[in-house]
Protein backbone atom coordinates (compact mmCIF):
# COMPACT_ATOMS: atom_id res chain seq x y z
CA UNK A 1 0.00 0.00 0.00
CA UNK A 2 0.86 3.67 -0.12
CA UNK A 3 3.54 4.69 2.37
CA UNK A 4 4.25 8.03 3.97
CA UNK A 5 7.91 8.59 3.19
CA UNK A 6 10.57 11.21 3.81
CA UNK A 7 12.16 12.66 0.71
CA UNK A 8 15.94 12.92 0.78
CA UNK A 9 16.24 14.29 -2.77
CA UNK A 10 14.39 17.23 -4.28
CA UNK A 11 10.81 15.90 -4.17
CA UNK A 12 11.21 13.77 -7.30
CA UNK A 13 9.30 10.86 -5.71
CA UNK A 14 5.55 11.34 -6.11
CA UNK A 15 4.35 8.07 -4.60
CA UNK A 16 5.93 5.11 -2.83
CA UNK A 17 4.12 1.83 -2.20
CA UNK A 18 5.30 -1.27 -0.32
CA UNK A 19 3.35 -4.53 -0.45
CA UNK A 20 1.38 -5.26 2.76
CA UNK A 21 2.28 -1.87 4.27
CA UNK A 22 0.53 1.50 4.54
CA UNK A 23 0.95 4.72 6.46
CA UNK A 24 3.97 5.70 8.51
CA UNK A 25 5.49 2.34 9.45
CA UNK A 26 6.20 -0.88 7.59
CA UNK A 27 6.60 -4.30 9.21
CA UNK A 28 8.43 -6.64 6.83
CA UNK A 29 8.02 -10.35 7.54
CA UNK A 30 10.74 -12.90 6.85
CA UNK A 31 9.73 -15.51 4.29
CA UNK A 32 7.09 -13.25 2.75
CA UNK A 33 7.46 -11.63 -0.69
CA UNK A 34 8.00 -7.90 -0.92
CA UNK A 35 7.30 -5.49 -3.78
CA UNK A 36 8.36 -1.85 -3.99
CA UNK A 37 6.64 0.56 -6.38
CA UNK A 38 8.01 4.09 -6.77
CA UNK A 39 6.59 6.79 -9.02
CA UNK A 40 8.93 9.71 -9.66
CA UNK A 41 9.68 12.56 -12.03
CA UNK A 42 13.09 12.30 -13.70
CA UNK A 43 15.38 15.25 -12.93
CA UNK A 44 17.96 14.40 -15.60
CA UNK A 45 18.63 12.60 -18.87
CA UNK A 46 20.41 9.35 -18.10
CA UNK A 47 21.01 6.03 -19.85
CA UNK A 48 21.96 4.16 -16.67
CA UNK A 49 20.33 4.15 -13.24
CA UNK A 50 21.76 2.55 -10.11
CA UNK A 51 19.61 1.43 -7.17
CA UNK A 52 21.03 1.59 -3.64
CA UNK A 53 18.96 0.24 -0.73
CA UNK A 54 20.36 0.96 2.72
CA UNK A 55 19.17 0.10 6.23
CA UNK A 56 19.92 2.85 8.75
CA UNK A 57 20.02 1.53 12.30
CA UNK A 58 20.24 3.52 15.55
CA UNK A 59 19.95 6.73 13.59
CA UNK A 60 23.35 6.69 11.91
CA UNK A 61 24.67 3.19 11.19
CA UNK A 62 24.13 2.58 7.47
CA UNK A 63 24.24 -0.98 6.12
CA UNK A 64 23.87 -1.78 2.42
CA UNK A 65 21.20 -4.46 2.06
CA UNK A 66 22.95 -7.38 0.31
CA UNK A 67 21.66 -9.56 -2.49
CA UNK A 68 19.43 -6.97 -4.14
CA UNK A 69 19.26 -5.67 -7.70
CA UNK A 70 21.50 -2.62 -8.18
CA UNK A 71 20.73 -1.97 -11.86
CA UNK A 72 17.42 -0.08 -11.83
CA UNK A 73 17.21 -0.32 -15.63
CA UNK A 74 16.22 -3.98 -15.13
CA UNK A 75 13.20 -2.68 -13.18
CA UNK A 76 12.11 0.11 -15.53
CA UNK A 77 12.73 1.31 -19.07
CA UNK A 78 16.00 3.16 -19.73
CA UNK A 79 17.23 5.57 -20.99
CA UNK A 80 15.11 8.12 -19.16
CA UNK A 81 14.57 11.75 -20.04
CA UNK A 82 14.40 14.76 -17.76
CA UNK A 83 10.81 15.66 -16.91
CA UNK A 84 9.39 12.21 -17.68
CA UNK A 85 7.09 10.56 -15.17
CA UNK A 86 8.64 7.18 -14.34
CA UNK A 87 7.59 4.11 -12.41
CA UNK A 88 9.94 1.54 -10.93
CA UNK A 89 8.46 -1.77 -9.75
CA UNK A 90 10.77 -4.12 -7.86
CA UNK A 91 9.49 -7.58 -6.92
CA UNK A 92 12.17 -8.38 -4.38
CA UNK A 93 10.82 -11.85 -3.68
CA UNK A 94 10.88 -13.53 -0.29
CA UNK A 95 12.76 -11.83 2.51
CA UNK A 96 15.47 -14.33 3.57
CA UNK A 97 15.01 -16.09 6.91
CA UNK A 98 18.56 -15.01 7.78
CA UNK A 99 17.52 -11.34 7.77
CA UNK A 100 17.98 -10.02 11.32
CA UNK A 101 14.98 -8.75 13.29
CA UNK A 102 15.73 -5.05 13.45
CA UNK A 103 14.05 -1.67 13.43
CA UNK A 104 15.51 0.57 10.76
CA UNK A 105 14.94 3.34 8.31
CA UNK A 106 15.11 1.89 4.83
CA UNK A 107 16.56 4.38 2.38
CA UNK A 108 16.25 3.93 -1.37
CA UNK A 109 18.33 5.97 -3.79
CA UNK A 110 18.26 6.02 -7.56
CA UNK A 111 21.54 7.29 -8.98
CA UNK A 112 21.75 8.60 -12.54
CA UNK A 113 24.72 9.71 -14.60
CA UNK A 114 24.38 13.23 -13.17
CA UNK A 115 23.84 12.40 -9.50
CA UNK A 116 20.84 11.47 -7.37
CA UNK A 117 17.72 10.85 -9.44
CA UNK A 118 15.42 10.17 -6.49
CA UNK A 119 15.81 9.44 -2.79
CA UNK A 120 13.33 8.50 -0.08
CA UNK A 121 13.14 6.58 3.16
CA UNK A 122 10.53 4.85 5.29
CA UNK A 123 10.50 3.65 8.90
CA UNK A 124 10.06 -0.04 9.46
CA UNK A 125 11.22 -3.27 10.99
CA UNK A 126 11.83 -6.89 10.12
CA UNK A 127 9.91 -9.53 12.09
CA UNK A 128 9.44 -13.29 12.03
UniProtKB/Swiss-Prot annotation:
CDD domains tied to this protein: Der-p2_like
Keyword Secreted tagged: yes
One cellular component (GO) term of this entry: extracellular region
SMART domains, sorted: ML
Secreted as UniProt keyword: yes
Keywords: Allergen, Secreted
Domain of life according to the entry: Eukaryota
Subcellular location: Secreted
Family the entry assigns: Belongs to the NPC2 family.
Protein name, per record: Mite group 2 allergen Gly d 2.01
Amino acid sequence: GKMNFTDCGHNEIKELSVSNCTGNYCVIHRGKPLTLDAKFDANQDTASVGLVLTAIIDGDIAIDIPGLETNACKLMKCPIRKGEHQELIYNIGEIPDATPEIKAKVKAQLIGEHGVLACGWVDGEVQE
